[in-house]
Amino acid sequence: DATMGKGNDTLFLCELAGEKGKVLAFDIQQEALDVTKELLKTHGKEMQAELILDGHEHMDRYAGKESADVICFNFGYLPGGNHNLATTYRTSIEAIGKGLGILKHGGMMSLCIYSGGDTGFEEKEKILEYVKALPGKEYTVIVNEYYNRKNCPPMPVFIFKE
């Protein structure tokens, strides 16, 4: 889980991984780690996850090449948190690139791009430019849009590594 936030995706990934699986979850805010730790403990999943207080752009320090089946991102800021602490396109694109190296062949990366806020529109544009340029023989990129929602709905993007 490249962007831990409140821990919901971390919990979901722990459930998918099963007892033998391991989930690495990243965030730069201690608040996110504390909330996630409590959520995992409540559900008996705290031993399946390693909660890492570090930026997602450093995930290659913690995971080996082609070692992950799934990598999830939710760009933006911590729900209910400080809006001044948000993802930026530079570190997000760096993290996506490193994540693609960590992803196994046949693996999937999900990106949930929120385009509101001060940096969200630029981040969305830059991330979409980046994923559009990925080699088609190595990756399949699927971009989804909500057509009937207002106020900058999130944009789900899926990248499958061939």
Predicted feature residues:
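Conserved beta-strand signature within the Rossmann-like core of class I S-adenosyl-L-methionine
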Residues: T3, I102-I113
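Conserved SAM-binding loop of SAM-dependent methyltransferases across substrates and taxa
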Residues: K6-K20
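Conserved SAM-binding motif I beta-strand of class I
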Residues: K22-D27
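S-adenosyl-L-methionine
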Residues: L33-E66
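Mobile active-site "lid"/loop adjacent to the S-adenosyl-L-methionine
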Residues: C72-A95
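Conserved class I S-adenosyl-L-methionine
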Residues: G81-L85, S110-E129
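A short glycine-rich, Lys/Arg-flanked "PGG" loop and its adjoining helix->strand segment in the class I
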Residues: T91-H105
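Class I S-adenosyl-L-methionine
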Residues: F121-E162
